[in-house]
Amino acid sequence: MTDRRRINGPAGATIPPVYEDSGISEVKALKIRSRPSNIIRKIYLKTGVTPSASGSAYLELETSANSGVSGLKLSCTVHGPRSLPRSSPFSPHMVVSTHVKYAPFATKQRRGYLRDPTERDLGIHLEAALRGAIIADRWPKSGVDIIISIIEGDQDREASKTQGDEVWDMMNTLSGCITVASAALADAGIDCVDTVAGGVAALVQDSDGSPEIVVDPIPSEHRKILAACCVAYLPMRDEVTNLWFRGDLPASDMDLYTELVEKGIQASRSANRVLVDCLTETVG
């Protein structure tokens, strides 16, 4: 008789470790950014991929020309608006619930089935970004669930874990989550003040040693990332709904902060054009 119980693999399974040596350093030195500093990667965005959900969308970023660097792949489903349980307290606004989860195979190290602190942080930032766009007072005592599955993370699978690129990969992941969630909300017919899109800008230091601000950074294409910010932006209202900084910047140079945010807004505008074209094609 066949055993139908589900047998999971070991929780700590990983790919074989890759250690830093002269060969890896030479390969890493060849990974040079081919895009201009103000151009984001190409985005593929499609709505209506999950018929059973109220709204859904799929987003995929262009895969880097460098070997071993995967492109971000996200799937988002929206369930609602629907009535809250009778036991829940009255809410004059719609209750927004976000859930971000990596697939077990999405990153170099296998992810567990329970959400870790990284995924909870992404969910909190995503909820803050979407609350500024949704017109929540039109659905009193109702709720909507926004679920994002990260099918493939945006990282260099040939790099060692000690290089610390995972911190900066979260920025690009959050940016993609904001954009794909906005498309899924529009597909679900939930009223928003504007389409919100995410963008990332980073202060990087390459081999020549001079810092430079680039949009949509890939950590493997730069020697070092000093700081980065992820911006959720409403282009028609010229408003920022969420701003996330990471890294070290001199407190005395406020112009550098301003320039970094402006570059993040520029990346958000580029992503928003793809979002609007996708929704226009769907309606047409």
Swiss-Prot record:
<keyword id="KW-0698">rRNA processing</keyword>
<dbReference type="GO" id="GO:0003723">
    <property type="term" value="F:RNA binding"/>
</dbReference>
<dbReference type="GO" id="GO:0000177">
    <property type="term" value="C:cytoplasmic exosome (RNase complex)"/>
</dbReference>
<comment type="similarity">
    <text>Belongs to the RNase PH family.</text>
</comment>
<comment type="function">
    <text>Non-catalytic component of the RNA exosome complex which has 3'-&gt;5' exoribonuclease activity and participates in a multitude of cellular RNA processing and degradation events.</text>
</comment>
<dbReference type="GO" id="GO:0071051">
    <property type="term" value="P:poly(A)-dependent snoRNA 3'-end processing"/>
</dbReference>
<dbReference type="GO" id="GO:0005730">
    <property type="term" value="C:nucleolus"/>
</dbReference>
<dbReference type="GO" id="GO:0000176">
    <property type="term" value="C:nuclear exosome (RNase complex)"/>
</dbReference>
<dbReference type="Pfam" id="PF01138">
    <property type="entry name" value="RNase_PH"/>
</dbReference>
<keyword id="KW-0694">RNA-binding</keyword>
<keyword id="KW-0271">Exosome</keyword>
<keyword id="KW-0963">Cytoplasm</keyword>
<comment type="subunit">
    <text>Component of the RNA exosome complex.</text>
</comment>
<dbReference type="GO" id="GO:0034475">
    <property type="term" value="P:U4 snRNA 3'-end processing"/>
</dbReference>
<dbReference type="InterPro" id="IPR050080">
    <property type="entry name" value="RNase_PH"/>
</dbReference>
<dbReference type="InterPro" id="IPR027408">
    <property type="entry name" value="PNPase/RNase_PH_dom_sf"/>
</dbReference>
<keyword id="KW-0539">Nucleus</keyword>
<dbReference type="GO" id="GO:0006364">
    <property type="term" value="P:rRNA processing"/>
</dbReference>
<protein>
    <recommendedName>
        <fullName>Exosome complex component MTR3</fullName>
    </recommendedName>
</protein>
<dbReference type="GO" id="GO:0016075">
    <property type="term" value="P:rRNA catabolic process"/>
</dbReference>
<dbReference type="InterPro" id="IPR001247">
    <property type="entry name" value="ExoRNase_PH_dom1"/>
</dbReference>
<dbReference type="GO" id="GO:0071028">
    <property type="term" value="P:nuclear mRNA surveillance"/>
</dbReference>
<dbReference type="InterPro" id="IPR036345">
    <property type="entry name" value="ExoRNase_PH_dom2_sf"/>
</dbReference>
<dbReference type="InterPro" id="IPR020568">
    <property type="entry name" value="Ribosomal_Su5_D2-typ_SF"/>
</dbReference>
